[in-house]
């Protein structure tokens, strides 16, 4: 029996930062299937377009009524009557025909908005899973051509100290994460992470005062830390105090594009201070040396966006220097875009993809980006955005694609824990048919 789309309705809802975002209800004979899209704060310039209204009289210009109108008036009429199991056909219709906008990196979604297209793409996935009478993660695995007899549960990369554009402190690097690779299961990994998180809170309170334990957009703490060493020392202390030395490692998201000066090709590690300390302005080569020193001193297993999104040369230098032992992840560099991934492969610029579905704007293209990366023996980390919703789609996606790693914030704030809690449910439902990635989070688990 064909399960056709009978109705599509989009609405404007609020994300975790209080900004508007797009939610879609898609109806078939099996019921209503809902999806909501996230949005980022530190966005890469090569991301597909997130359509905002720019009407300063509503939500300070951040409204998404244009995207809503595009769904209700342009996309919905074309999709009604189509079979919800035709994911690729529907995504291609939206991206290539109804939108059709392109730039040098592929389909840019600048006409209808990636936020409009993605919301429908996700809702279609949920409807397709119901039509096939399988869970969303099993259906996504089928779409990706992955085996679904034994699924992989990811290591959670929990963002517990915030800096960069996500925080009001002086810390230039954006995220410091704890990675419980030594746990025997996802459930235990989450427990390790939560215990380290609470231990860290006590350490911060002791050292910086009670008001230093306020949390940022992703649930991490943002004490008035001045540099990366100070943050890493705090993490090492918290991990040790919680009893998980050797079992919990560290990952960083530098988000270096946020403090890169393209005119003189330097990185300002004091970019949040009006009269910055000139000794903290570094060349790319000096930054390479800084990362090498940090990796020698601390149990760092992954570094994301260590350089600007166009600094291919220094990416390649760092990957050549430490890529065997440390995952070098491209986020702003790659923006989940198969064309950018291909360029990075040619230049040996990094060895892992950060997979953000809203950077590329459709589930079909996100799967393509993942498969291209895995085919070339890269790691893949599925990721949230700093402006999130209660939608848990990425929890199912990470299990389906067998990537072995996910970052979706600290074990704090409901829009973050919603994803972790969904992974707990998935692990429970799979029972013996689940394997936890653990120490092998970088390896091919396909």
UniProtKB/Swiss-Prot annotation:
Highest rank taxon of the organism: Eukaryota
E.C. number: 4.2.1.11
Major localization listed first in the record, in broad terms: cytoplasm
NCBIfam families: eno
InterPro entries: Enolase (IPR000941), Enolase-like_C_sf (IPR036849), Enolase-like_N (IPR029017), Enolase_C (IPR020810), Enolase_CS (IPR020809), Enolase_N (IPR020811)
Gene3D superfamilies: Enolase-like C-terminal domain (3.20.20.120), Enolase-like, N-terminal domain (3.30.390.10)
Subunit record text: Homodimer. Forms a complex at least composed of DegP, ENO and HSP70. Interacts with G-actin. Interacts (via the DKSLVK motif) with mammalian host PLG/plasminogen (present in the mosquito blood meal); the interaction occurs at the ookinete cell surface and is required for ookinete invasion of the mosquito midgut. Interacts with A.gambiae EBP; depending on the Plasmodium species, the interaction is either involved in ookinete invasion of the mosquito midgut (P.berghei) or is dispensable (P.falciparum).
Residues that, per the record, bind Mg(2+) 1: 42
Modified residues (Phosphoserine): 42
Sites of Phosphotyrosine modification: 139
Any Gene Ontology CC annotation: cell surface
Co-factor(s): Mg(2+)
Name used for this protein in its record: Enolase
Active site (record annotation): 218, 356
